[in-house]
Swiss-Prot record:
UniProt transit peptide range: 1-31
GO cellular component, one term: mitochondrion
Chain positions with N6-acetyllysine modification: 443
Quaternary structure, from the entry: Homodimer.
Annotated organism of origin: Mus musculus (Mouse)
Entry's family note: Belongs to the class-II aminoacyl-tRNA synthetase family.
Pfam families recorded: HGTP_anticodon, tRNA-synt_His
Function statement: Mitochondrial aminoacyl-tRNA synthetase that catalyzes the ATP-dependent ligation of histidine to the 3'-end of its cognate tRNA, via the formation of an aminoacyl-adenylate intermediate (His-AMP).
Modified residues (Phosphoserine): 66
Keyword DNA-binding: no
Name of the molecule in the record: Histidine--tRNA ligase, mitochondrial
GO molecular function: ATP binding; histidine-tRNA ligase activity; identical protein binding
UniProt-listed NCBIfam families: hisS
């Protein structure tokens, strides 16, 4: 600057002053803010990178079903549904969730097991707990007085799952119900007949259907001295006798639900009884039960029921069991539950235990709870425990080494040569048009060995082979995959020959 004039020196000094001035407060704050954001983003990124790998799994109490499992499950469902249809039932489906207020009063002690949905549209909703309450709502909403229906669908219960025994939080139920005013015990007897047909058809082993009547249960409670305010909760405890010993149930009644010990002991005298029509007749003479008109009404219906069961040819599969209570509050009359007597994994060895595999009963007042005018539609029905049955069937198949085909393909269209995609497409379209289940590899030029291996692995019974020689001669080869035998037939008779072989197999 010594060579600059005074003015130029002052200008230069001012310029240097501007350049060397400390940053303003606003600038400092802005810079600090940007730095803070950058640091925070960096920390978040670091934290994200340090998180453990996400575990991919299904929610607790649920599961996926593989293609092999789906084949077994569908066969079980087909047998159950065909039985329902054989008895004249119509199919029905209802929403997977219902208005919460419609469900809460119907389950009482089981209310805490329901899955509630988050309120997003002004309606409080819950996933359905069973298929019975939605059916009753459907009858009331549509003012139906008579209906014989079946329904297959998933239900949800927030229980502790026991997956090793076929018990889940999400599971499938198959229900059959008869709604309407009919002469006593005829529909009830048919429901028990259906239960026997299904369990016999599935070949699960020996089974027993335990029956009782809620009026008999309430009568027992009354003559034993159970306060009316505790009837429902004590009945809920008694329903656990299939999972707990009488000592455990008694402890729950006394210690947790406040029942007097002497009252619990009097109940214990009754729950040991089980038998057939002779037990019903003996109970009529019981000096304690004879004091209850409600119990006598139930015993009268049970006596009539056993007569119909004898005519249906299933009386030997049914046993009156006074320990059976069925905890759901909507039951009003006959109740029943099917159990497998013993399903040995191997002769004389391990036993597969899954509890009850079917249950049901009469619920005459449920529809009236939905109907604005309180109109009664008596109902009786049953529910098949598909998951537990599936568990048993699956275990038996594992023990026997039985294999399952995951497809129903009957014919595979193949070629040993290149550039024969068009011919294969024409043939497979012809087979599909004839209703034949067929497939092919999605490649222009597949290797013949690859096609043969695919057929053998998938257990496809027949293979159609087309090549240049066959096309020129107007013929086609038909190969039996199992025996590896091949025959040459006229191209025009392909469909007829395949249909003939399939009908003979």
């Amino acid at each position: 600057m010594p060579h600059l004039g005074p003015l130029r020196r002052r200008a230069w000094a001012a310029l240097l002053g501007q350049l060397l001035r400390p940053p303003s407060t606003v600038c400092t704050r802005g810079c600090h803010s940007q730095v803070a954001k950058a640091v925070l983003t960096s920390e978040q990124l670091k934290s994200h990178q340090e998180k453990p790998n996400f575990v991919i799994k299904v929610p607790k109490g649920t599961r996926d079903l593989s293609p092999q499992q789906m084949v077994v499950r569908e066969k079980i469902l087909d047998k159950i549904i065909s039985c329902f249809k054989r008895h004249g039932a119509k199919g029905l489906d209802t929403p997977a969730f219902e208005l919460k207020e419609m469900l809460t009063e119907k389950y009482e002690d089981n209310f805490g097991l329901m899955y509630d949905l988050k309120d997003q549209g002004g309606e409080l909703l819950s996933l359905r707990y069973d298929l019975t309450v939605p059916f009753a709502r459907y009858l009331a909403m549509n003012k139906l007085k008579k209906m014989k229906r079946y329904q297959v669908g998933k239900v949800w219960r927030r229980e502790s799952p026991a997956i090793a025994q076929g018990r889940y939080r999400e599971f499938c139920q198959c229900d059959f119900d008869i709604a309407g005013e009919f002469d006593p015990m005829i529909p009830d007897a048919e429901c028990l007949r259906i239960m026997c047909e299904i369990l016999s058809g599935l070949q699960l082993g020996d089974f027993l259907i335990k029956v009782n009547d809620r009026r008999v249960v309430d009568g027992i409670f009354a003559v034993c001295g159970v306060p009316e305010s505790k009837l429902r909760t004590i009945c809920s405890s008694m329903d656990k006798l299939d999972k707990m010993s009488w000592e455990g149930v008694r402890h729950e009644m006394v210690a947790k639900k406040g029942l007097a010990p002497e009252v619990a002991d009097r109940i214990g005298d009754f729950v040991q009884y089980h038998g057939g029509i002779s037990l019903v007749e003996d109970l009529f003479k019981d000096p304690r039960l004879s004091q209850s008109q409600l119990a006598l009404q139930g015993l009268g219906d049970l006596k009539l029921l056993f007569e119909y069961l004898r005519l249906f040819g299933i009386a030997d599969k049914i046993s009156l069991d006074l320990s059976l209570a069925r905890g759901l509050d909507y039951y009003t009359g006959v109740i029943y539950e099917a159990v497998l007597l013993e399903s040995p994994a191997q002769a004389g060895k391990e036993t597969l235990s899954v509890g009850s595999v079917a249950a049901g009963g009469r619920y005459d007042n449920l529809v009236a709870q939905f109907d604005p005018k309180g109109h009664h539609v008596p109902c009786v029905g049953l529910s098949i425990g598909v998951e537990r049955i599936f568990y048993l069937v699956e275990q038996k198949m594992k023990m026997s080494g039985e294999k399952v085909r995951t497809t129903e393909t009957q014919v595979f269209v193949a070629t040993p040569q290149k550039n024969f995609l068009q011919e294969r497409l024409k043939i497979i379209a012809e087979l599909w048009d004839a209703g034949i289940k067929a497939e092919m590899l999605y490649k222009n030029n597949p290797k013949l060995l690859t096609q043969l291996h695919y057929c053998e692995k998938a257990d496809i019974p027949l293979m159609v082979i087309i090549g240049e020689q066959e096309r020129n001669e107007g013929v086609i080869k038909l190969r039996s995959v199992a025996s590896r035998e091949e025959v040459t037939i006229n191209r025009e008779s392909l469909v007829a020959e395949i249909q003939k072989r399939l009908s003979e197999s």
